[in-house]
């Protein structure tokens, strides 16, 4: 029985890795072993980055809401608490968009939150 060396499979796998490593500097884009290590690490960083992006955007939205709420005389935590007591469930992304693009609607939400905090 003839020996099978997986020539096609190996070549395809190596070409795939080198294609992913395109644009890397020096040996990282030319040599399979070095490129494989670089690609593995970059895929790991990409995975971590996708998780971090969600945290970063949430922090950005909260910062924007806080700035807009303080401009209307209420802190972020009291504003969110007032909205919860009022039964208004708008996510932070939408609140930050409203704070930037639709100030009148945001001001109405602030007034509603203030009313429900005092009640």
Swiss-Prot record:
<dbReference type="InterPro" id="IPR035566">
    <property type="entry name" value="Ribosomal_protein_bL20_C"/>
</dbReference>
<comment type="function">
    <text>Binds directly to 23S ribosomal RNA and is necessary for the in vitro assembly process of the 50S ribosomal subunit. It is not involved in the protein synthesizing functions of that subunit.</text>
</comment>
<dbReference type="InterPro" id="IPR049946">
    <property type="entry name" value="RIBOSOMAL_L20_CS"/>
</dbReference>
<dbReference type="Pfam" id="PF00453">
    <property type="entry name" value="Ribosomal_L20"/>
</dbReference>
<comment type="similarity">
    <text>Belongs to the bacterial ribosomal protein bL20 family.</text>
</comment>
<dbReference type="GO" id="GO:0000027">
    <property type="term" value="P:ribosomal large subunit assembly"/>
</dbReference>
<dbReference type="GO" id="GO:1990904">
    <property type="term" value="C:ribonucleoprotein complex"/>
</dbReference>
<protein>
    <recommendedName>
        <fullName>Large ribosomal subunit protein bL20</fullName>
    </recommendedName>
</protein>
<keyword id="KW-0689">Ribosomal protein</keyword>
<keyword id="KW-0699">rRNA-binding</keyword>
<dbReference type="GO" id="GO:0003735">
    <property type="term" value="F:structural constituent of ribosome"/>
</dbReference>
<dbReference type="GO" id="GO:0019843">
    <property type="term" value="F:rRNA binding"/>
</dbReference>
<dbReference type="GO" id="GO:0006412">
    <property type="term" value="P:translation"/>
</dbReference>
<dbReference type="GO" id="GO:0005840">
    <property type="term" value="C:ribosome"/>
</dbReference>
<dbReference type="InterPro" id="IPR005813">
    <property type="entry name" value="Ribosomal_bL20"/>
</dbReference>
<keyword id="KW-0694">RNA-binding</keyword>
<keyword id="KW-0687">Ribonucleoprotein</keyword>
